Amino acid sequence: MDVEHDDSALQDLEADRSATGGSGDAVDRGFRKVMQIIRAATDERDLYKHKSLRFEKLKGKRKHQRSLRINKQWRLVIELRGEAPNKKVGVIAIEDYH
């Protein structure tokens, strides 16, 4: 899927292996792994197939957003933008789940 980063720091974190996100090396590596899966996906159905990502819709004020688990503590918040076949993933933030 095509990706748009809302935060340039996340774009740098994905592209530059020496960049750090401030949440630790394991989170940085996990983020890059999730981004590889997103880029390889043809649509959101492929994301649901990866059970470990726990791809899910958020609720309340954030019902237009989705999340993917980086690890037990951290999640990647995204938005699905546009219509198929030109749907894009907007990468919003890495958040502490708890």
Language-model features and meaning:
Residues M1, S8-Q11, R45, L53-E56, ...:
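Flexible, active-site-adjacent loop/turn segments at secondary-structure boundaries
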Residues M1-Q36:
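Arg/Lys-rich, positively charged N-terminal/basic patches that mediate binding to nucleic acids
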Residues V3-E4, K51, K87:
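Residues that recognize and position ribonucleotide moieties
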Residues A26-K33, H50-L53, R69:
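Generic alpha-helix structural propensity
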Residues I38, T42:
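Basic, amphipathic alpha-helical segments enriched in Lys/Arg and hydrophobic/aromatic residues
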Residues D43-R66:
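A short, surface-exposed loop/turn module that caps and links secondary-structure elements
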Residues K59, R66-H98:
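Enriched for short, Lys/Arg-rich terminal
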